[in-house]
Structure formats: structure tokens, C-alpha cells
Amino acid sequence: MNTKYIFSVFQLSLLFVFSSCCDKNSCQNEKKSSKLTQQSIIDAASSDTSAVRQSLVRINSTIQIWSASQPWDKSAPKKRRALGALLEGNRVLTTAEMAADATYIELENADNTRIIPAKVVAIDYEANLALLEPDNGDTDSFFKDLKPLRLGSSAKIGDRVDVWQLEDNGMPIVTDAVIQSVDIVSSFANGHFFLTYEAKGSMQSASNSFTVPVIRNGKLLGLLSSYDSKDQIIDIIAPEIIQAFIADTSDGDYVGFPSLGIGISSTVDPNFRDWLKLSDDLGGLYVTKIRKDSAAQKAGLEKGDVIININDKAIGRRGYYTDQQYGRLYWSHLIRGSLKQGDTLELTILRGGEQKQIMATLTRPEEPLVARDTYDQAPVYLIKGGLIFQELTATYLKAFGKDWQAKAPLNLLDIMMTPEDYEKDRNKIVFLSAVIPTPATTGYERLRNFIINKVNGQTIADISTLIDAFKKPGTDGLHTIEFAE
């Protein structure tokens, strides 16, 4: 500390000696130059600060998730905070993670002086995107002096981007990052993969942890979906996905990203390739499943077909193709990243050793037998005589914990893995989830996770048919419940 002080005094003394040696004009010029340089830095800093503060909106959400074991109840409320990107029309773009299962959402300006309640305009759990807008309140006052961001174009590997953050006190933080790779990533709803930039940058810890905007050349490039502080890797939802999402909301009726509706496996194994009659110059994906009423089924695709081309893009043995801009990408981007519902694509397949062309019109998948994403939806259940009946969902199975695929009941897991074996005469799977201890249920307390086939002789397709069946007891007034084997 003393050394630093002495050195500072020595510097000041030296500066005084040199300054006394210059003439009046040169001293004035140096002072003027110094003043201009300092003013330029201040102006630039003010400009950057203004851009961040004027285009970012704080988002505060209260989240409550429905209980799987007690479907009439909710978990304790949790708070989430994030930064959203202000768009044209006083709308705010954020991730679905900030809006899913939210009981209350509010918008707050950068300096914490104005707050307004918000509502969800559109949400896509699969792509992890949500669009918010004010819900009553003084809209004009809230958005006064704020400037919307324009959507930017796609980037390439090596491009530099800025990650915008705000401290609690409103001070902006701008982190420089470099795009290192592009991949297809699932960021929120499991099993749904979308185009994602992976950038390298050391982000500072700030109050907004769930998502922040990423900027390139003054325009919105994407939204942060995750950050690995150890490896300093930032996952960014790509602009193509955001643009498709925004375009779909323009008519007020959000549809969502299309699906082909198939299950696939790779064709790497040489013995498997010989059996499929695949030559060495062909890649290909083996079709293992065709979803009921899907675009693939309507187009005539069959289980056992091998997809070797999609819209003239050769599909490799592991499912990758060469994208003109990004290089090697997984085949799903050809469906969910560059096309919309109603678009037609051409599939070149190998069936029995012969190549065929199939045209498929993309659609949204129908509600599956076992619903995978039940965000913002209360569990469908019925309590009758102390017996709790539910419709099976992936949410229920995941409630068994981190290792749910090993801990959940095997009979219910089998339904999720092979729903086609259970679809006959069913819209949903109804099962007995638990028994409430009462005098009437004595001896039945351990009954749980049994699939319901019939009640009072009526086949059970969903909860609504279960309710109808219980209205028709036997002549003795008793109800008969038949479980699946």
C-alpha cells in the first residue's frame, strides 16, 4: 500500500515537471484533446448503457406446479427472474421456462421504477419460447422511452455476439462471446430438439438467471437457454427458430412446429446394412415407429423403411446431413427448423432394396396416448369411494425422481415406450394411482398403479367414460372394476 502511494506521488511530481515545460498553446491543445477523448468515451458508454436499458425488460414469474401424487394440489410457489427482449407492439420475448405453470407474471423496467402485469400471448414448450404482453395497467407509461429490438439474421461460427444482462441496481453488463459450434439441442421439454448456437464466453453472475437476450450487430440474435459456468459455454436459441415462432403468432392463432411422426434408428452396423440391402455409398435412417395419424402415416411411410434423402439432402448413417450454412446437422432440423405446418417435403426411401419417392405434408402431431408435456394443465383425475383414478402422463412417471425410468412402475413405463400396443379402444390410459384410507377402503390401501380396462362392463377410454361407467352400477348397487393383466 505504501509503495503504491509513493509511486503515485512520484508520478504526479514528474507530471508537474513536464507540464511546466510545455508552452501555453501546446498545453491547451493537449487539454482539449484529452477532453474530447474523454467525452467520446463517455458518449460511447452512455450509448451502450442506453441500448441495454431501453430494450431489456425484467420478467418476474410466480410458478406453481401441479402435484402428481395428489392431483388436486399444487407445490409451493417459486419465484423466477429473467430478462426479456422488447419487440415491436409492446411484446416481450422470453423462454417458455419463464411462463410455463406461471400463476402470475409481471414486467419491470431496467431501473425498477415501473411494474405492469403481463399475460402469455403464445408459448411453445418444445422450442422453449414464449411471447408476453401487458395485461391491463398503464401501458403507455411503462413503455415510454423504451425501444424495441429488431430480429437479426443468422450467424456463423466465429462470429462475436454480446450477452446483455442487468444488475439489480439497473447497471448493464455486456459479455462478449464467440460462436464456436451449431447443434440441435433440447433445452426445455424433453425429446424436442431445435437449432442452437453454442458460444464461448465468461458471463458474470447477475440477478437474472433463467434467460437473457443475445445481441449481434445491434439486433436480437437469440435467447440464452443455458450456461455452463465450468466450461463457459452459452447455449443460444437460434434466430431461425425465433423467427418461425414470431411469424406463427402473427394471426393470433399459434399452431407450433410441425412433425413427421416417426421413430428412427441409425444404420451404422454393417450386418444390419447388409440385411437392409444398403450399399456403401448410401447413409439412411431406419424407421422403427410410425405415429398414428401422423404426416408419415398419411404419406404411406412404413415401419422398416429406410430414409436416405429428405428434400434432396442425403441423410447419413447416424442421421446427419450437410447444411449449406452450418455444416453437419441432425436431420430433424429439415423438418422442425426450416418448414412449417402444411409444407410438403419429398422423402427418398429404400423399401425392400428398391428406392421410392414419397411426398409428405407436415402436420402437428395429435395428442398421444401418454401426454409428454403437461405444462399449465391440471391432472385429469376422479376420486370415487376413496379410489383415485388418473390419466397417465409422462409428468406422473417423472415424479418418481431423477431415475424415474428405473423407479416408476414397469407396467406404466411399458405403455409410454410402446403406446401402439395399448391404443385399441383407448384415447388415454386410465389407472388407479392411489387409495385414500377410509372405512370403505380397508384392505385396499396398497392397490396402486393398476390399469383400468372396464368398469361395470363398460370399456374405459378416458376419464370421461369412467365417469359415465360409474353412473351405471350393477343390479346389486355394487361397482365392478376390471384391471388389465
Sequence positions of predicted segments:
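C-terminal motif of bacterial Sec signal peptides marking the signal peptidase cleavage site
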Residues: F18-S20
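N-terminal activation segment of mature serine protease catalytic domains
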Residues: C27-L86, V92-M98, Y104, N128, ...
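C-terminal cap/linker of serine protease catalytic domains
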Residues: L36, S40-T49, L220-S279, Y320, ...
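Active-site region of chymotrypsin-like
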Residues: S55-N60, D135-P148, I173-I236, D280-T288, ...
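PDZ/PDZ-like domain segments forming the peptide/carboxylate-binding groove
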Residues: S75, M203-P213, S265-N309, K313-G316, ...
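Conserved active-site neighborhood of the chymotrypsin/trypsin-like protease fold
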Residues: E88-I173, M203-Q204, Q357
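PDZ domains, with a preference for the canonical peptide-binding region formed by the helix
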Residues: M98-D101, K298, N309-T348, K454-A484
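Flexible, gly/ser-rich surface segments that form the specificity/activation loops bordering the active-site cleft
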Residues: A122, S141-T196, S205, S226-D235, ...
